[in-house]
Design a protein with these regions (language model features):
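E2/UBC-UEV (E2-variant) core
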Residues: 114, 127-128
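Extreme N-terminal basic, low-complexity initiation segments
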Residues: 2-8
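Long, positively charged leader/targeting segments at protein N-termini
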Residues: 32-94, 98-105, 133-494
Length: 494
């Protein structure tokens, strides 16, 4: 459907969160005292209601920016609204998009060949930096210029702000490593651009260096929304005002709250689509309005938005299980993949929408793939169902090794209790291996978090966030490695 939101980011260094994550605190659930103190300090320099600056650019606006005791700054309904009512609407022409960046006077002269070689996310990042440096260039940029000023005055918090020592507090989790990889990729990309003279002129004229480029991508990580369009393309948008809404895990995950809509007036060209926020439920006047940034784990929220949610129901751990791709088992893998959330990934360097489970062939430069990676975003609420879909892959690989010349392997070949038990044991061993990379017990982390929360020191905010991530991930892994002799997976029927 036109305008369906993409709920996860590309698996590349240049596109990190795909849902808007506004500042400074973003969860409907109350945050720790230390985190709220730090957030209050970061927002002290902002205007009382930064939304007012954009009033003339909104098609409709029925919210106002307000401070809330439980969450910090958020968006309050100006009047009572019903579920589905419009809260905010802004034309795309006033938003940050790759199309707007290509029309930027500093970037347009580079020509289509060069601009086509720059990713949409990088185009938006460069546009933000250019406008931040020089202000508006014509009426089309005035709204974006105001937004760039606000972005420059706002502390952008992501895991890229954490020091190497602070990231070590996440040891065991992939989120301890991802920020360094991302920063390295961004800096390398910027360095490569510095060998292209026309871009160097743009950089020098607008004081753009590697640090600024990383900052702009942090803005995208925390504020960008992506929409899957009917033609198969993806539209990335940073919408002034839309990025001021807070996240709620109680808001429904879907495409009805933040969406692309045609203009309400027939006199307005259809090309001027609107970025719209609609109420996911009824709100009273003055009540904070939220939408869901998607079913993101605390690790992903911390990476892209600098916050976590205590007891986040969407917490997950990402498994990457490599299996040999023997000729006899290839059709069986493909058949089993149909039961996965995302099926079989075919071609391309990344998935535009990253499902919770999918099978991906490992590229082989010298010929056909010889291995596959089974990606599983293991969530606490669905552990049993997900592992039940994974065990048959291990069983299939066992059968293929035992009979490499077999040509009749099918789902009907699976389900023998003894084979299923061994396959479950192998899966549990993989999970245990991942669990062993985490230091300490779940109980020790819970006790440490409780002690830090009691102290309420702002200086411990990041330590508390790290513990929330580790607690969520350890709880999932500890649940997934119950003894095989009592594990229902070992005795599952075919």
């Amino acid at each position: 459907r036109e305008g369906v939101r993409v709920a996860a980011a590309r698996c590349s260094s240049s596109a990190f969160g795909a849902r808007a994550v506004p500042w400074p605190v973003r969860s409907e659930r109350p945050m720790s005292a230390s985190y709220l103190k730090a957030a209050a300090a970061r927002s002290a320099a902002l205007p009382d209601d930064p939304l007012k600056a954009f009033a003339s650019y909104f098609t409709e606006c029925h919210v106002m920016s307000t401070e809330f005791a439980a969450t910090g700054r958020g968006m309050a309904a100006q009047r009572a609204v019903a579920a589905g009512d419009l809260l905010l609407s802004i034309p795309l022409e006033h938003c940050w998009t790759a199309e707007a960046a290509r029309l930027c006077p500093e970037l347009a002269p580079l020509g289509d060949a060069v601009l086509d070689a720059i990713s949409p996310e990088n185009l938006i990042a460069l546009h933000i930096l250019i406008v931040r440096a020089r202000g508006a260039a014509g009426d089309g940029d005035r709204c974006r210029a105001l937004h760039a000023e606000l972005l420059a005055a706002t502390h952008v918090e992501t895991l890229l702000n954490w020091s190497e020592q602070e990231l070590e507090m996440l040891a065991g989790s992939k989120w301890a490593l991802a920020p360094s990889w991302m920063r390295q990729d961004l800096e390398q990309e910027f360095d490569e651009w510095c060998h292209y003279a026309p871009l160097v002129e743009v950089f020098n004229a607008h004081r753009i260096d590697a640090a600024a480029f990383v900052w702009a991508h942090q803005v995208l990580m925390s504020r960008m929304i992506s929409f899957a369009l009917a033609d198969g393309s993806t539209l990335h948008v940073v919408g002034p005002g839309v990025d001021m809404f807070n996240h709620s895990i109680d808001a429904p995950v879907g495409n009805e709250d933040v969406r692309l809509e045609p203009p309400a007036s027939a006199s307005v060209p259809d090309a001027e689509r609107q970025l719209v926020v609609r109420a996911s439920k009824a709100y009273a006047a003055g009540e904070q309005a939220f939408f869901s940034y998607s079913c993101a784990s605390n690790g992903r929220l911390l990476l892209s938005g600098g916050f976590v949610i205590p007891g986040n129901p969407w917490d997950s751990v990402e498994l990457a299980l490599t299996l040999p791709l023997l000729e006899s088992v290839t059709p069986l893998y493909a058949a089993l993949a149909q039961a996965l959330d995302g099926g079989l990934e075919s071609g391309g360097a990344f998935a535009e929408f990253v499902p919770s489970e999918f099978l991906q062939p490992v590229p082989n430069e010298s010929g056909p793939p010889t291995a596959v990676v089974l990606h599983v975003r293991l969530a606490y609420a669905t552990i049993a169902e997900q592992l039940a879909r994974v065990v048959p892959f291990f069983e299939a690989e066992m059968l293929a090794r035992a009979a490499p010349e077999a040509r009749d392997l099918s789902p009907d070949s699976l389900g023998q209790p003894a084979n299923r038990r061994v396959a479950a044991q192998r899966l549990v061993a993989c999970v245990l291996e991942l669990r062993s990379t985490y230091a300490g017990s779940l109980e020790a982390d819970e006790a440490a978090l409780k002690a830090l929360e009691a102290q309420g020191a702002p200086s411990s905010a990041r330590r508390q966030q790290a513990l929330q991530v580790l607690i969520g991930e350890k709880r999932i892994l500890d649940t997934a490695v119950v003894p095989v002799d009592v594990c229902p997976l070992a005795c599952m029927p075919a």
